[in-house]
């Protein structure tokens, strides 16, 4: 009887452990995302607030219908408009830092959700921070615009909805409607959507050995891209490379930083790459901790390498003088 009682107790404890395992994994993931958001907030609020003030100082935003029409008249205009609205909150750096923290959390969570939809094991959750870390590196450039982050979020949301469509006709209709809308609203990040569709459909077709169908989908996507670009060129007289939406992500439209294309590529392929990593159900917390420490060790010097603290100091001084001048003017 004592042996049977011990066996029952062991079975109960094992069942409790099995039931608690998903909860503990969820808590670990939530904790990592919250820690990520807090780190981003502290950086922009304490370490790099001058860059937020610089953006707010040299931007004019109007709640005006004519201004809205002017902004959305170009590819990526909606992302530009939304980002310019959000930049107004940079006037108070704590609000600007909060905005950025929320946006960066959104980038990481959407990356993970897309990877999870491809079957990525929970153990690789820390690796979903990689694209967002690259965006952080890029945003330390004072000429990098917030519209890039907004456009990335738009595109990742479009990708996520696509993963729930299981019939080819629904997917085809979704692409035909969403692709031109996304190109116009988000700009060049539509290339992530395009790449996601191509990789997803090729994977499905090759798994079913429908090679010609896969090639046809690739040709169709490039034809859709060319058609949309041609229609845009009729309305907007800009170079072809700008008609893909590379207009509002950087302060100088004629410049397309390599980092933009690197980030676009990273968001496109990483969810699929994570799903191809080896599966393991043992020592999950240990592996997650090791990945997290490796990310910190790599990202810390990586982020610092993109910071220019001389410019940061100059921007902070300039902003302080500007506000002091405005205060004296108001007193007079």
Language-model segment annotations:
Residues 214-276:
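Membrane-embedded alpha-helical segments of integral membrane proteins
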């Amino acid at each position: 009887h004592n042996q049977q009682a011990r066996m029952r107790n062991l079975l109960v404890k094992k069942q409790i452990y099995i039931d608690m395992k998903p909860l503990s994994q969820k808590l670990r993931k939530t904790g990592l995302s919250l820690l990520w958001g807090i780190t981003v907030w502290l950086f922009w609020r304490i370490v790099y607030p001058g860059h937020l003030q610089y953006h707010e100082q040299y931007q004019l935003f109007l709640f005006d219908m004519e201004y809205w029409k002017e902004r959305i008249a170009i590819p990526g205009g909606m992302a530009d408009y939304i980002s310019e609205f959000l930049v107004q909150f940079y006037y108070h750096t704590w609000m600007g830092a909060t905005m950025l923290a929320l946006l960066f959390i959104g980038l990481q969570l959407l990356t993970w959700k897309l990877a999870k939809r491809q079957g990525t094991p929970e153990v690789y959750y820390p690796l979903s921070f990689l694209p967002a870390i690259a965006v952080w590196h890029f945003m330390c450039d004072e000429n990098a615009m917030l519209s890039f982050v907004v456009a990335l979020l738009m595109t990742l949301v479009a990708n996520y909805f696509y993963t729930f469509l299981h019939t080819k006709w629904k997917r085809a209709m979704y692409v035909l409607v969403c692709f031109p809308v996304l190109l116009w609203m988000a700009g060049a990040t539509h290339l992530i959507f395009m790449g996601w569709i191509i990789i997803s459909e090729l994977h499905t077709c090759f798994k079913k050995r429908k090679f010609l169908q896969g090639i046809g989908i690739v040709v169709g996507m490039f034809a859709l891209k060319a058609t949309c670009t041609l229609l845009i060129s009729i309305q907007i007289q800009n170079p072809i490379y700008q008609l893909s939406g590379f207009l509002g992500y950087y302060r100088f439209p004629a410049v397309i930083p390599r980092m933009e294309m690197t980030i676009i590529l990273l968001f496109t392929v990483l969810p699929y790459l994570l799903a191809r990593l080896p599966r393991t159900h043992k020592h999950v917390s240990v592996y997650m901790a090791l990945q997290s420490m490796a990310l910190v060790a790599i990202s810390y010097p990586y982020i610092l390498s993109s910071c220019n603290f001389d410019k940061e100091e100059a921007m902070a001084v300039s902003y302080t003088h500007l506000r002091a001048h405005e205060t004296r003017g108001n007193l007079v």
